Amino acid sequence: MARILIVDDSPSQLLGIQRIVEKLGHEFITAEDGAAGVEVAKRELPDMVLMDVVMPNLNGFQATRTLSRDASTKHIPVILVTTKDQDTDRMWGLRQGAKAYLTKPFSEDELAEVIERIFNTAEAPPPSAA
């Protein structure tokens, strides 16, 4: 079982993603914006971060860049989940350090596939022990 940090300023989006993460058998922690997400990630060191892009205080691109450049968090894979569906946004997100970029709305199966693919790559550390 992995512990996944979900960062989204929309309560309904947070709830929807939480349900999927729980259904996959993973634990979750949450943050309501990019700044809080960076703080929680540094403190809790989750196995993965699911990060919205359009948020107050620190957007998801900035938060991803911060996490990918910090020695204590650069090993944590970040999946950007956002309504921003332009190719330039996708490329920018990946350049900031995201391992994947998923546009909303997405299916439960699509999110599950991306999470499992990231956990099964050599770069990602194994999920935390339960």
Task: Please tell me what each predicted stretch does.
Residues F106-E116:
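C-terminal output helix
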Residues E44-L50:
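Active-site beta3 strand of CheY-like receiver
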Residues G25-E32, V40:
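Short hydrophobic/Thr-rich beta-strand motif most characteristic of the beta2 strand and flanking loop
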Residues M55:
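Receiver (REC) domain active-site loop signature in two-component systems and cognate sites
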